[in-house]
């Protein structure tokens, strides 16, 4: 039986400063990560953002339109918080940098699932068959992440080689698949430990690919 835990309000910070549009995007990301896209209403997003419903429809024609723009904003957040700011990005050796990336993702798996789960991964699980524009926006965000990570993987392959049949892009997508699956396991189990175990297995697998050529 999944471990139980006390539910709380969305914990992702919605900035007090910024335009109404920025507040709505931040509120959408926080609320969808907490309760899912379908269960999130425009009224809840407006309340979390501290703006009126009129302001919402001034900036966005629909909840779907906001979701699409928020997916792009999520891509920008990932670029800064995952690929630019952390110390692992400055490790000189590309293989060590790749392993540093996985270590960093492992370190993020703590606390309630809404604090570490993927916004676009959450949305696309619900909307892949009901909103093609949302599906495409989520795909673009996930693809951007994979291609960004593939740059480091390719540099590591160029230096160390890799197991036969493995490309940088395919491995980057596999890393994404493990992470997204780990988020789902943590949500189902109610505990991030199971997700951490999955990412630790991922790290062992990546090391094996570069040592068993």
Where are these regions (language model features)?
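All-alpha amphipathic helical-bundle segments outside canonical DNA-binding/catalytic cores
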Residues: 92-96, 136-141, 158-174, 193-197
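Hydrophobic alpha-helical bundle segments that form small-molecule/ligand-binding pockets
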Residues: 129-134, 143-171, 208-213
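N-terminal intrinsically disordered/low-complexity leader segments
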Residues: 1-19, 157, 212-213
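Amphipathic alpha-helical segments used for helix-helix packing
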Residues: 97, 111-136
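Amphipathic C-terminal alpha-helical segment
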Residues: 108, 175-193, 206-213
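Hydrophobic alpha-helical connector segments
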Residues: 69, 83-116, 168-175
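Helix-turn-helix
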Residues: 2-4, 23, 27-65, 69, ...
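Hydrophobic alpha-helical segments that form the core
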Residues: 116, 121, 166-185, 201-205
């Amino acid at each position: 039986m999944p471990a139980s835990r006390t539910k709380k309000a969305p914990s992702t910070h919605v900035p007090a400063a910024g335009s109404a549009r920025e507040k709505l995007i931040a509120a959408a990301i926080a609320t969808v990560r907490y309760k899912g896209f379908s269960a999130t209403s425009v009224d809840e997003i407006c309340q979390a953002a501290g703006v009126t419903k009129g302001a919402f429809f001034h900036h966005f024609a629909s909840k779907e339109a906001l979701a699409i723009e928020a997916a792009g904003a999520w891509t920008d957040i990932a670029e800064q918080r995952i690929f630019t700011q952390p110390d692992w990005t400055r490790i000189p050796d590309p293989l060590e940098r790749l392993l540093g990336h996985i270590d960093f993702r492992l370190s993020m798996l703590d606390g309630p699932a809404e604090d570490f789960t993927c916004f676009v991964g959450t949305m696309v699980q619900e909307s892949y068959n009901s909103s093609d524009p949302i599906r495409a926006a989520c795909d673009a965000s996930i693809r951007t992440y994979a291609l960004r990570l593939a740059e480091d993987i390719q540099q590591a392959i160029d230096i160390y080689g890799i197991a036969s049949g493995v490309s940088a892009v395919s491995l980057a997508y596999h890393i994404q698949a493990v992470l997204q699956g780990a988020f789902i396991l943590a949500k189902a189990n109610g505990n991030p430990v199971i997700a951490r175990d999955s990412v630790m297995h991922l790290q062992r697998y990546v090391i094996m690919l570069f040592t068993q050529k």
